[in-house]
Amino acid sequence: MMKPDLNSPLPQSPQLQAFGSRSSDLATEDLFLKKLEAISQTAPNETVKNEFLNKEIPSINKLFTRFLKNRKKVIDWDKINPPPADMVLNYKDLPAITEQRTSELASKLAVLKLNGGLGTTMGCTGPKSVIEVRSEKTFLDLSVQQIKEMNERYNIKVPLVLMNSFNTHQETGKIIQKYKYSDVKIHSFNQSRFPRILKDNLMPVPDKLFGSDSEWYPPGHGDVFFALQNSGLLETLINEGKEYLFISNVDNLGAVVDFNILEAMDKNKVEYIMEVTNKTRADVKGGTLIQYEGKAKLLEIAQVPSSKVEEFKSIKKFKIFNTNNIWVNLKAMDRILKQNLLDDMDIIINPKVADGKNIIQLEIAAGAAIEFFNNARGVNVPRSRFLPVKSTSDLFIVQSNLYSLEKGVLVMNKNRPFTTVPLVKLGDNFKKVSDYQARIKGIPDILELDQLTVSGDITFGPNMVLKGTVIIVANHGSRIDIPEGSEFENKVVSGNLHCGAL
């Protein structure tokens, strides 16, 4: 199919004109739009072409135009304040909910898991949600089991909603067939697919709608509001009598439904709740909840002026961070979407190198929506509600005796003398799940572990015990094989050691 002349005017169709206010860089904006329209001409059929023209192009162009308008705009640091006491509820102060009230609220709830990520950072192919994390169960298995247990206990039907990306949608559709007899209703939808943008000239990277997947990206989990509306599921959930949606990352094993939080939301007519928790040294880069011009606002490190980054990382000033566990009133979401208020969500500019090209991705975060909802609040929750598995170091912790699995929920071992989780850093030799499994013959007893650092060519024997601070380093070209039953407490191990040497 011939490509249109990029210098010719665009068709005067409503879907290509209704993009709202223009930026000052009209030439760039117009050329970007023409490039998108040219991409649409490569669609395999009219249905796909019209879908891209009517839904994707307006969304892409709206985000790009706002980026052009605001790219030189910086946050006014002097207007940033810690959230006042009444903006962040303390979880410990929330009244306990009765069993009858729990059943009432559960009937109004839907649960959404953000399922767009791949397992590539852990050396796996396909959706990250199918990695086995505990007792041969995957992230998705645990999510389904939790909802199944809740539905049976309260005799209700809370649905599970999965927001996939173009990277995970097709395979997820096949995987969820295994749950068709589980009595858990699963809705699955695909979030948007935006073109990566060349950093030097701000033009789309792809020239075909279905060329290389590496030329496209999902525009962040903030797309959940728009994608839920575009899929028709927002309307479906409201029509089914659902009033509340609990959103979380599928890899956060601590993000289970908590009816004390939902009761506080319902009782106080709160439209949006962001769960936050106290920062540790490991969380200094996490987004934080602030008060800005009298409103609740999410502040991400990418928005912070370079001169203020160290201040942002300070635990003294910014004591909490966003867990990305979010509770939303569905009717309020529907209202603000129809009012186009979320079109002003903050844009995160994510620079990358892809296929040797310097590119940028324009992304939005689900937490950035907080400032557009009425009576929005944070809830400072226990650390146990933030248990993400981003690496094999995290996998090491959740597979250990630090936790047990009860009805799909990870519960910390009562014999752990501290409430904190140990800091574990496994080196590059453990980065892939396959290498991690080959090198660790059995997860050690870590009930009394504070910190573990492992670097180099190392293998763990079964039935080990680690306590306090343990550092194990194999020098370059050397190897350490730790024998079965070894016990280390506040110990540094280095050099070149083999089985039986310790």
UniProtKB/Swiss-Prot annotation:
Residue span of region Disordered: 1-20
InterPro entries: Nucleotide-diphossugar_trans, UDPGP_fam, UDPGP_trans
Biased composition regions of type Polar residues, renumbered to the chain: 9-20
Keywords on record: Nucleotidyltransferase, Transferase
Gene Ontology BP terms: autophagosome assembly; cellulose biosynthetic process; culmination involved in sorocarp development; glycogen metabolic process; UDP-alpha-D-glucose metabolic process
Record: residues binding UTP: 114-117, 128, 191, 220, 251, 390
CDD domains: UGPase_euk
EC numbers for this chain: 2.7.7.9
Residues holding substrate: 116-117, 221, 249-251
Catalysed transformations (reactions): alpha-D-glucose 1-phosphate + UTP + H(+) = UDP-alpha-D-glucose + diphosphate
The keyword Iron-sulfur is annotated on this UniProt entry: no
Gene Ontology cellular component list: cytoplasm; extracellular matrix
Enzyme class: transferase
Loss of function: phenotype: Cells undergo aberrant differentiation and development ending with small, gnarled fruiting bodies. They also have decreased spore viability and decreased levels of glycogen.
Annotated GO MF terms: UTP:glucose-1-phosphate uridylyltransferase activity
Reported function: Plays a central role as a glucosyl donor in cellular metabolic pathways.
Protein family according to the UniProt entry: Belongs to the UDPGP type 1 family.
Name by which UniProt lists this protein: UTP--glucose-1-phosphate uridylyltransferase 2
Organism listed in the record: Dictyostelium discoideum (Social amoeba)
